[in-house]
Amino acid sequence: STQKKLVTLGEYVSRMPEEQKYIYYASGDSVEAVDHLPQTELLKDRSMEILYFTDKTDEFIPDIFRTYGDKAFRSAVDGDLELGDEKQPETADHQETLDFLKETLGSRVDQVKASGKLKSHPVCLTSGEGMTFEMEKYFAAVQPDLALKAKRILEVNVEHPAFAALESARITDPDRAKKYAEILLNQAML
């Protein structure tokens, strides 16, 4: 990620900061698309290396190899990056709005939670453990009848102005708040 060119796993590991425990990877249609994923923001801010997977079958590599040397693979789109010092936001003050988001969005998301990894972005979708969004796309193209779905976790930056607007609207204008919820989900799906 720091050099945005093809690298071997050996080169990647040699450039990893000492405190980086995992081989982080993120997938997308292009280097530019991966580079702009909200989920990678915290890793990049910490100068962590990220493998950019741009081929549809790249996402199968971590499942096949699991490790390289003593380093395990971990998706940047997973819910927990296991950085050790990730700031977990206080949710007690925001739980009603998080519940409102889940209720409004229904089955389109499996879970809504406050995020400790977002900084400048209001929301992102993570897949948790198991199937990723890129794998879902791959299987949909190869076998459309299979209907395999990745888990969709909407992570929300409770310190972002967009969340503050949603929280205010939830109290004063619930119909407007529902529109904000739709906008946030659409933003996360981009």
Where are these regions (language model features)?
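Long, intrinsically disordered, charge-dense linkers/tails
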Residues: 1-190
